[in-house]
Amino acid sequence: MNVDYKSVVELVLNCKSLILNNDKAHQITVKGLADYVTQVDFSVQSYLTGALAERYPDIQFLGEEGQKHTLDWSRPVWILDPVDGTTNLIHDFQESCVSLGLWDGHELVFGCVYNPFHEELFEAVKGRGTYLNHRRVTVSDRPTLAKSLIMVGTSPYDKGRADQVFDKIKRLYVASEDIRRSGSAAIDLCTLGCGRADGFFEYDLKPWDYAASIVIITEAGGTVTNEKGEPIFPGERSAIVASNGHIHQEMLDLLAK
């Protein structure tokens, strides 16, 4: 599969004006409990799917917005979240991003996460390392959970599991130096990938939430698994446990209690 990743990143950067269009950010459709989509989401997805399909017509699409259909995972798939952090966007809380990953039929090989509010571009190609604004970055080297900053996520869509979710988060909070949450899983995962944080946990994420960031973290030297320590398949929802590698087993053991 021959993909010009530099040109793909340029397409993602072109989404800046679409995301910063405040008028479209307030054209809101309610999909479910605390689950929103704005005209920005539709505009970004329409632009990227159109541009990528023109250049790579044989690559399939999995996107947050739009019709879901059966995919052939033995073939390449773009995995797109046009706006990760839609609720943030609606509230003008400036932690939202475009997240684009590529599955080559066997594994995730490319990830790009772009936050236009802070002009931060994370990108990684398998075997080539991870870059933040074209500067190579790696995960931290903190050796213990007690000295680590942990990113956590909570879903507003299923508050019936709040006690179960927050029990796990409480364990991490007590055992670590502290916890943080931005409201965007992709941004939180990239915060780990560039060494600003040391671990990440969220109970239930969809493929477009995490696909790009898995490449960004692993190419930066980190580890990403489910709660059982197993590899992630990007065709399904999953709990995500990610770390700098040093504290991974400690996190898994704590979450399993």
Question: Model segments located where?
Answer:
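N-terminal subdomain of lithium-sensitive/metallo-dependent phosphomonoesterases centered on the IMPase/IPPase/PAP
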Residues: 1-83, 246, 253-256
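Residue-level signal for inorganic ion chemistry
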Residues: 15, 19, 41, 52, ...
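Short secondary-structure boundary/capping segments
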Residues: 28-29, 53, 68-71, 113, ...
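Acidic active-site catalytic centers that drive phospho-/nucleotidyl reactions
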Residues: 41, 64, 81-84, 88, ...
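DPxDG-like acidic metal-binding loop motif
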Residues: 72-131
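An extended, acidic
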Residues: 138-257
